[in-house]
């Protein structure tokens, strides 16, 4: 049975004082949660702070992006080896906000996925469709293209200990949320697509949902078949909200 995973994506938020209060509140509030894996993905400058506060707790930490290169003349980039030095367990790759703003291709995202795996960091690989793609009836085609880019480069073996996050782009940072049935159908399609190419990986890979999850809808969403947890944006910045979502996943 797949263990649930709840990941907070802080995006470009926080400062040292706010982070300290939030992280310490999460440590206190979640210390008795035993049956859910919990992580926060913080901005690069705060990795050391997260490492310092969260070490020895039941909360892991990670980053929101990684370079596809190991090292070299890539100004502004941060390598997987650097993330590993700060104890990062997870890294988000392919989030729609980055793909849109920085024109990241599926091939580029696949390289980031592979290098994270090479350094022992669990990639959280985001896939999803725009509202136009959903309304045009090509949702599955759009998701399949994103999945196939990684599967063709990495193969099924690299899905071991990886995470896929289904994030309907039209629900990111909005008040719109996929219905539980819409989310379940998308997760089921993703698992079936993986099974068609790499049967051994399909049942073990965790597929989490990201799209305006909040304390009010978390229990219903996270109880659906094939939904193995959540990638939480706005509500991960509030300790009470994030704790309630984590407990809803139990």
From Swiss-Prot:
Amino acids binding substrate: 9-11, 173, 212
One Pfam family in the UniProt entry: TIM
Subcellular location per the Swiss-Prot or TrEMBL entry: Cytoplasm
Keywords tagged on the record: Cytoplasm, Gluconeogenesis, Glycolysis, Isomerase
GO molecular function: triose-phosphate isomerase activity
Quaternary structure, from the entry: Homodimer.
Protein name from the UniProt record: Triosephosphate isomerase
UniProt source species: Methylobacillus flagellatus (strain ATCC 51484 / DSM 6875 / VKM B-1610 / KT)
Gene: tpiA
